[in-house]
Amino acid sequence: MLFATMRQILFAVLALAFAPLAHAQAPWPDAAPDQWVMAHVDVETTGLDPARHEMIDIGLIYTDLAGAELGRLYVRIMPDHPERIDEGARRVNGFDVDYWRAHGAVGEAEAVRQIVEFHHRMRGEKRVIFTAFNAGFDLSFTRALFAQHGVSWNDLYFYHILDIPSMAWGQGLTALNATELSRDLGITDETRVAIEHTGITGAAFNVSVYRALLARRPH
C-alpha cells in the first residue's frame, strides 16, 4: 500500500512538472497554423568555422506558413577580426572592409540588438521556426553571435528547424545545389555576383523556393 501511494505521488509530481512543457508545445502547426511564423534566414561570413570566423551580414524574411511575407531585415555587420577572412568566402560575398564601412556596416552588438528587436516585433506571441537553405551553417553562426552578446538562440526560435533542401528532397527533387534546384523549380537563382550576394538575397531566394515547393503540393 505504501509503495502504491508513493508511486501515485511520484506520478502526480511528474505530471505537474511536465504540464507547462506540454502546454508550451501545443498547438502544433497543423492544428493552429496562424500561431506560427517562419524565419527565413541567410548569413554571409568570413569563413566556415563559427569558432574562428564571423558573420558579415544577415538577411531575415519572416513569413506565415503559406509563405506570405510579414517583414524583412538586412544588417551588414563589421566583424571584429576582418583579417581572418577566408579567400573562398571573399570570392562568394565580396567582403571588403572599406566597402562595408561605406555601406552602413554596424558592430556585432548593434546587429544583435536589431535582430532581436525585429524578431519580437514580427512574432508577437507566436512561435518562430528557423528556416534556411544551409540550415546547419546559418544556425551555427547565428547561435555563436547571439551567445557572444548574451542572447540565447533557444529563447528566440522553436527547437525544430527546417532546411529547404530536405523539403525539396521529400518531393523528389534531390539536387542539393541551389542553382540546380532553382532550375528544377523554374525560378530565378540567387545572384552569383559576389558583392551583390548578400544575406537578404539569400533569404529572398529561400522564400521563393519555399513558395515554389508549396505550389507543387497536391491540394
Predicted regions located by residue number:
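Bacterial N-terminal signal peptides that target proteins for export
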Residues: 1-10
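Cleavable N-terminal signal peptides
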Residues: 11-12, 22
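Conserved non-catalytic scaffold segment of RNase H-like nuclease domains
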Residues: 29-39, 46-135, 184, 191, ...
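Acidic, Mg2+-coordinating catalytic module of metal-dependent nucleases/exonucleases
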Residues: 129-136, 140-146, 177-219
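Catalytic phosphate/metal-binding cores of nucleic-acid and nucleotide-processing enzymes, i.e., regions
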Residues: 140, 150-154, 169
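Short alpha-helix plus adjacent loop in nuclease-associated cores
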Residues: 160-175
